[in-house]
């Protein structure tokens, strides 16, 4: 692109529409000086800015560029070689703030209690209620007594990093005990689906509450933790007003030990566990090709974990700890499975581009992933896909 010719074309188009540089800058959300630099040939607008101006002026991008010739002065239509629309794409890195705090509809932090518990026995990002005993089992003997955590890895997981599969245990000797999380954003009038994998040493009624920053109760309902194995209990809570510093609290007054394997809180209007407003913006971008799960994170990912129910999938501790620490405290919570990713691509009109994990997955396991995605229901993993609600590849 010849910046001088482009600048002259931009100025001509602007003057034809009786726009000042300030007015054009306001329409493009750029300073007036930027418009002047373009017109003097000192700088070049981005393609998105050219596209915006072409719509504004009612012309083509080629008209604004002021030069219809290609390299070496050849006409632009001289080369009839078709270029694949999949030559360029975007990357959905399943780590850091891209999913957790990004496209994921989950609003709770550390919802599977990873890492070492804090000083008072509560997992990081959670606070304890009352002077009771909060702890997370940390030895084989404790797990023998209290049972294994709810979260787990699927077959073929070889990394075995630290404190990925934890649970939060609360022992109450009388009175009220529980745990909570603060600094949550609630939308006014929005319904939130709360789900928890729980069990208890004696049948225990848990009170689940949404609270405002001033301590007022927006909504409160109960679920029951039963003895025996974990069960997922669910209810819907509604926030009566917008609050940027809301709280979720889980409390009980039974003399018992309650074991919480995972918790979830997300708006009921999500799409496969993802935010609809973010997906709408992705549609606007016109993404043609979307890569997932990484990037660097491809070397962390065990695809078969995604075959487990979402709340049961073990978090993944990242070897790129310094990259993930500011976002998710060094862990990823595996919110998106292969099925979810493909559904997202179909929703936004993008071609899915899946990256394998040659570091920890064998060639056979990678081939099984290809089989899961592309083969019919007459194969082992084709049947698994069909059982998950997707009979067609």
Predicted regions and their residues:
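A short, Lys/Arg-rich alpha-helix, primarily the initiator
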Residues: 1-16
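Catalytic-domain carbohydrate-binding cleft regions of carbohydrate-active enzymes
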Residues: 90, 334-335, 341, 348, ...
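DNA major-groove recognition helix of helix-turn-helix/homeodomain DNA-binding modules
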Residues: 48-63
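Alpha-helical residues within the helix-turn-helix
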Residues: 15, 26, 55
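Active-site groove signature of glycoside hydrolases
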Residues: 252-253, 293-294, 379-393
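Short alpha-helical DNA-recognition segment
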Residues: 18-37
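Extracellular and organelle-lumenal recognition/adhesion modules and their flexible linkers in secreted
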Residues: 60, 71-334, 351, 361, ...
């Amino acid at each position: 692109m010849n910046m001088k010719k482009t600048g002259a074309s931009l100025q001509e188009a602007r003057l034809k529409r009786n726009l000042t540089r300030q007015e054009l800058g306001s329409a493009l959300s750029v300073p007036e000086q930027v418009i002047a630099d373009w017109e003097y040939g000192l700088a070049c607008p981005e393609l998105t800015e050219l596209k915006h101006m072409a719509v504004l002026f009612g012309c083509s991008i080629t008209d604004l560029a002021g030069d219809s010739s290609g390299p070496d002065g050849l006409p632009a239509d001289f080369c009839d070689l078709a270029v694949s629309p999949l030559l360029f794409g975007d990357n959905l890195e399943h780590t850091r703030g891209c999913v957790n705090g990004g496209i994921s509809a989950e609003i709770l932090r550390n919802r599977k209690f990873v890492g070492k518990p804090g000083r008072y026995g509560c997992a990081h990002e959670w606070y304890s209620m009352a002077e009771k005993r909060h702890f997370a089992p940390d030895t084989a003997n404790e797990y023998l007594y209290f049972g294994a955590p709810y979260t787990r890895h699927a077959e073929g997981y070889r990394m075995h990093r630290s404190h990925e599969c934890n649970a939060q245990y609360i022992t109450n000797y009388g009175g009220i005990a529980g745990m909570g999380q603060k600094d949550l954003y609630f939308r006014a009038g929005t319904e939130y689906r709360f789900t928890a994998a729980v069990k208890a040493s004696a049948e225990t009624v848990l009170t689940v509450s949404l609270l405002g920053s001033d301590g007022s109760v927006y909504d409160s309902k109960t679920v029951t933790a039963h003895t025996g194995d974990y069960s997922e209990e669910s209810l819907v809570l509604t926030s009566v007003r917008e609050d940027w510093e809301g709280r979720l609290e889980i409390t009980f007054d039974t003399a018992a030990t309650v074991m919480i394997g995972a918790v979830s809180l997300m708006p009921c209007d999500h799409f496969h566990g993802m935010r609809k407003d973010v997906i709408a913006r992705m549609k606007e971008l016109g993404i043609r090709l979307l890569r997932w799960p990484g990037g660097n994170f491809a070397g962390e990912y065990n695809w078969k974990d995604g075959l487990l129910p979402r709340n049961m999938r073990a978090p993944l501790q990242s070897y790129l700890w310094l990259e993930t620490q500011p976002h998710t405290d060094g862990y990823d919570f595996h919110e998106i499975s292969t099925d979810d990713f493909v559904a997202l691509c179909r929703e936004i009109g993008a071609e899915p581009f899946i990256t394998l994990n040659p570091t920890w997955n064998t060639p056979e396991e990678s081939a099984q992933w290809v089989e899961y995605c592309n083969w019919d229901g007459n194969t082992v993993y084709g049947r698994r896909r069909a059982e998950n609600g997707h009979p067609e590849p």
